């Protein structure tokens, strides 16, 4: 692959704006933590139990207390906690679904390492076992300047586009397409991430999320122009 472009809509970018070199995606690691304790009768023999639910709860609080990094933004979130089997049973199992993020790969790795320490510490505190399983990851985005300039030149010709800019100073999430971008660039290709602005009824991942469908036509025409007008014989 010589040229690669990923696209998104929204993310706080206003309608009529196309960001042709989005570089604010955070590196991220997604993982599950499986806690295994010992079940016991909660009324008759509670001392025989090793409470996986309490270990997971302690880990959750510790994860959200990880210190920030001086070199950039970081994030951690426990999105799911599942535990236990019955109200009269000391919980023998618990599951946490966790993600870490960082403005760079280094910062994300720092948060991830601290997260592993917190989880292991909570497991030790309650005398339970824990296993973490990697579920996904992405790197930070670093668009290729020449490709960004070409995308800007094409987006600027599309009706409904008020401005085609290189980047924005705004927070974003993470994006697995960054791994494909990095792979293309490692093989001397060029890559970028384009965000098409649109009005949103509610933020991303909100149950009331909706968008103005005019952005779809703008995106399709931009991508069409990018391919149809490209100087294939000489490249850029």
Regions found by a protein language model. Give the residues of each.
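Histidine/acidic-residue-rich, glycine-tolerant segments that coordinate divalent metal ions
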Residues: 1-76, 80, 85-89
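Metal-dependent amide/peptide-bond hydrolase catalytic core
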Residues: 53-236
